[in-house]
């Protein structure tokens, strides 16, 4: 409760599977949120919804779900920690979705855990030179943050770790060397996999 005053941001990390998400909670989410949403869409538009629906939920201590947001796309960084565990062919699922045969598909999941964390544009550690992205102090993401900052160290990342580029672009540094630069607040998501969450 003492930490509930911080701003709602884009996802800063995640892990999958979640230990709270048991059969009882899944049923509650389906009955209270997912099925009424899809049914309401059909009643309001006369069309069946075909695609991905992402429900951003908050689960209370009483295990009651509340909706924060609904998107018609995969969540970010949620997809980065969920999809590596999917063993069913994603293209096959997409085809079945478009053909109206998704109900015939069986999803197969790895028992491994995936944990992801976002590297963000934070507060500058030292004042920037006047020619760099406007200079001056900035608080960092989710507030005003620096862009066009060089990214280094990716060659040191364990090869088993997945690196997703969220806010990066190639450019040239002062020596005209091609390298990665930041373009947004959430810059990279690094996802590791293990047999347990602790691993």
Task: Name each model feature, range by range.
Residues 1-33, 72-86:
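ATP-dependent carboxylate/phosphate-activation module, predominantly the ATP-grasp catalytic core
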Residues 30-53, 71-158:
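Active-site "cap" helix and flanking loop/linker of ATP-utilizing ligase/carboxylase catalytic domains
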Residues 145-189:
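Generic long, charged, amphipathic alpha-helical segments
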Residues 59-63, 121-122, 172:
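Short acidic-glycine loop/turn motifs at beta-strand connectors
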Residues 56:
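Short, surface-exposed charged micro-motifs
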Residues 14-17, 117-119, 186-194:
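Short, well-ordered beta-strand elements within core beta-sheets of diverse protein domains
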Residues 53, 66-68, 186:
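Protein kinase-like catalytic core scaffold
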Residues 196-198:
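Short amphipathic alpha-helices within nucleic acid-binding modules
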């Amino acid at each position: 409760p003492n930490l509930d005053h911080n701003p709602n941001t884009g996802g800063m990390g995640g892990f999958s599977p979640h230990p709270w998400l048991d059969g009882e909670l899944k049923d509650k989410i389906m009955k209270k949120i997912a099925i009424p949403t899809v049914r309401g869409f059909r009643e309001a538009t006369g069309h069946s919804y075909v695609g991905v629906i992402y429900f951003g939920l908050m689960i209370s201590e009483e295990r009651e779900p509340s909706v924060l947001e609904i998107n018609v796309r995969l969540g970010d960084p949620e997809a980065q920690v969920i999809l590596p565990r999917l063993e069913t062919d994603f293209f096959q699922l997409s085809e079945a979705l478009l053909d109206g045969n998704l109900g015939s598909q069986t999803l197969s999941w790895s028992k491994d855990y995936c944990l992801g964390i976002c590297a963000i544009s934070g507060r500058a550690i030292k004042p920037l030179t006047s020619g760099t992205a406007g200079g001056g102090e900035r608080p960092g993401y989710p507030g005003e943050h620096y862009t066009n900052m060089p990214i280094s160290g990716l060659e040191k990342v364990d090869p088993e770790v997945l690196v997703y580029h969220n806010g990066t672009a190639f450019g040239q540094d002062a020596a005209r060397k091609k390298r990665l630069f930041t373009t947004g607040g959430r810059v990279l998501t690094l996802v590791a996999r293990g047999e347990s969450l602790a691993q």
